Design a protein with these regions (language model features):
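Eukaryotic intrinsically disordered, low-complexity regulatory linkers and tails enriched in Ser/Thr/Pro
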Residues: 1-66
Length: 66
């Protein structure tokens, strides 16, 4: 999961495996495979960075035997 911030400042944790698309239309909208959409403060680039960092941690753990 990745931590993001709703426009009202409240944190939200999203399962990055369920992200279908991320778009910017004034605000950043994360659409999930469930059909739900979440508005967040983070930019598309920041969301991408967090997803990549999360996946790297997961795959590194799998390969190191942790």
């Amino acid at each position: 999961v990745i931590a993001l911030t709703r426009p009202n400042g409240h944190p939200v944790m999203l399962n990055c495996d369920l992200i279908e698309s991320v778009e910017r239309n004034g605000e950043t909208i994360v659409t999930l495979t469930t059909g739900n959409a979440v508005l967040v403060r983070e930019s598309m680039e920041e969301i991408e960075r967090r997803v990549v960092a999360f996946k790297r941690r997961i795959y590194a753990s799998a390969h190191s035997g942790e």
